[in-house]
């Protein structure tokens, strides 16, 4: 019986060179490649399919776009998911991709699982958090052979593997419907100014439309369900928001990121829809949740984001946090109006049937509340600080 290994396959340089390496260096008879569609460009999927058909023994392309948005992106929105300002597009997709690879591997009777992640990044941990739940061997050629980008390019040429990257432009790009990451090459120098050519989803602000774009975003139970009153599927909504916000230059991040291993990395991201939807959701929460809920949920959201960034979505705590978050989102229903203009996002208004805000009570022109009633509260506000000052003054 053929000795099979299942490889998480993107069609990029790293995973493409893994195919001959797994045969030549590791002794596997067959390499089964699995590409998981979580919203990459259609041409990227087709390119990966065409390449895999030539160099792998068998190839799967699994459509997980709607599942990704429904089960991973929407929970991220409800949790205001962010790690050091990063919207975690790559992070949140890896567990789903890994799970789909495991499913295909079992179907094929593979004895091992492989990925093309390096030993310096986070993705190795995210994939293996899922892979190591199985009894299959886990292979990481990039890490185990300590491979460099230049070596991979030369190796690919020797084996007739077409590559899109070059030694002068060795950008590593990862895309899904939630974000696009660009790293590698000169981008690793934090003092290097990224060339405009690395951006594809977002228009440079000086080239955006001269008129602002106003969008109404409808939410139900913490999840975006409509744009300008038009209801649509989760995937379609995120895709449309990417187009609208990207055209107006919204959603670029250039940051120094603390990886799980402790290394600092320079990262460039594009995430138009994520920028807008996360901001709109957080704003709506402020309208409908109590001060205590918002304060505690911030702690929960931060812990949720860290687990998601680490790829630990099978941790019991992750499910516990989601239970609280889901309960908190039951009232997060309403509409947020945003303006997108020259790279800037502005929240214009928000409304909800569950709003805790009362225009009548808060108005300076209203006498619904007798202002004198707050005098008793004011007398004791800062009471302990006053007592402390008296004690200190006696010393």
UniProtKB/Swiss-Prot annotation:
Keywords: Amino-acid biosynthesis, Arginine biosynthesis, ATP-binding, Cytoplasm, Ligase, Nucleotide-binding
Binding annotation for ATP: 8-16, 116
GO cellular component term, pick one: cytoplasm
Keyword Ligase: yes
Coarse class of the protein's main subcellular location: cytoplasm
Superkingdom field: Archaea
GO biological process annotation, one example: L-arginine biosynthetic process
GO molecular function, one term: argininosuccinate synthase activity
Family matches, as Pfam families: Arginosuc_syn_C, Arginosuc_synth
Protein name as annotated: Argininosuccinate synthase
Native organism: Methanosarcina barkeri (strain Fusaro / DSM 804)
Gene of this entry: argG
């Amino acid at each position: 019986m053929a000795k099979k290994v299942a490889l998480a396959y993107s069609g990029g340089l790293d995973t493409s060179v893994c195919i001959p390496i797994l045969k030549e260096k590791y002794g596997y008879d067959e390499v089964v490649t699995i590409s998981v569609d979580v919203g990459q460009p259609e041409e990227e999927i087709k390119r990966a399919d065409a390449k895999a058909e030539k160099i792998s023994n068998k190839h799967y392309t699994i459509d997980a776009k709607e599942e990704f948005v429904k089960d991973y992106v929407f929970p991220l929105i409800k949790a205001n998911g962010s790690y050091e300002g990063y919207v975690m597009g790559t992070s949140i997709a890896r567990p789903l991709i890994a799970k789909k690879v495991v499913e295909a591997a079992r179907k094929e009777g593979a004895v091992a699982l492989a990925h093309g992640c390096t030993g310096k990044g986070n993705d190795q941990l995210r994939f293996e958090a899922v892979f190591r739940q199985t009894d299959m061997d886990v292979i990481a050629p990039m890490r185990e052979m300590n491979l460099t980008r230049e070596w991979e390019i030369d190796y690919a040429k020797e084996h007739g593997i077409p590559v899109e990257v070059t030694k002068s432009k060795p950008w590593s790009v990862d895309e899904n419907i939630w974000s696009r990451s660009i790293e590698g090459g000169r981008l690793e120098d934090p003092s290097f100014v990224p060339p405009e050519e690395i951006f594809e989803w977002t228009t440079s602000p000086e080239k955006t439309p001269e008129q602002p774009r106003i969008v109404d975003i409808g939410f139900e139970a913490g999840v975006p369900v409509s744009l300008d009153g038009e209801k649509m599927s989760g995937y379609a909504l995120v895709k449309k928001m990417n187009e609208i916000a990207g055209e107006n230059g919204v959603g670029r991040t250039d940051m120094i990121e603390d990886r799980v291993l402790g290394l600092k990395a320079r990262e460039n991201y594009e995430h138009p829809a994520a920028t807008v939807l996360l901001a709109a959701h957080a704003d709506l929460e402020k309208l409908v949740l109590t001060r205590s809920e918002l304060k505690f949920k911030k702690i929960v959201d931060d812990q949720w984001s860290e687990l998601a960034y680490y790829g630990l979505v099978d941790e019991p705590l992750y499910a516990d946090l989601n239970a609280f978050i889901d309960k908190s989102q039951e009232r997060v229903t309403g509409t947020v109006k945003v303006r997108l203009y020259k790279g800037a996002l502005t929240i214009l208004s928000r409304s909800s049937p569950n709003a805790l805000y009362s225009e009548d009570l808060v108005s300076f022109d209203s006498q619904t509340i007798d202002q004198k009633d707050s005098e008793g509260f004011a007398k004791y506000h800062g009471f302990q600080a006053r007592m402390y000052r008296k004690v200190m003054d006696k010393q």
